[in-house]
């Protein structure tokens, strides 16, 4: 019985992948490429793109925010997928 319980605990930990955090790029526009680990529970990355008087602006980070009209948004759910 103890063996069965231990097996179930191990399988649960492996399946849930406890402690896992998503990693996303977070550099802005033409800055050097950097990434960061997202907060626990944040499982997506985003890339926002828009134009203003400075040219094309790109913002990257964790999550999937809501945006105003005229801003292109791409959300994804794999490691470093928002480049």
UniProtKB/Swiss-Prot annotation:
Disulfide bonds: 24-45, 38-62, 64-75, 76-81
Taxonomy, superkingdom: Eukaryota
Main subcellular location of this protein, as a coarse class: secreted
Record-given protein name: Short neurotoxin OKI-Ed
Gene Ontology terms, MF aspect: acetylcholine receptor inhibitor activity; ion channel regulator activity; toxin activity
Tissue note: Expressed by the venom gland.
Entry-linked InterPro entries: Snake_3FTx, Snake_toxin-like_sf, Snake_toxin_con_site, Toxin_cobra-type
Organism: Laticauda semifasciata
Keywords (A to Z) from UniProt: Acetylcholine receptor inhibiting toxin, Disulfide bond, Ion channel impairing toxin, Neurotoxin, Postsynaptic neurotoxin, Secreted, Signal, Toxin
Compartment list: Secreted
GO cellular component: extracellular region
Similarity annotation: Belongs to the three-finger toxin family. Short-chain subfamily. Type I alpha-neurotoxin sub-subfamily.
Keyword Signal part of the UniProt annotation: yes
Upper taxonomic lineage: Eukaryota, Metazoa, Chordata, Craniata, Vertebrata
Pfam families in UniProt: Toxin_cobra-type (PF21947)
Signal peptide: 1-21
Function: Binds to muscle nicotinic acetylcholine receptor (nAChR) and inhibit acetylcholine from binding to the receptor, thereby impairing neuromuscular transmission.
Keyword Disulfide bond appears in the UniProt entry: yes
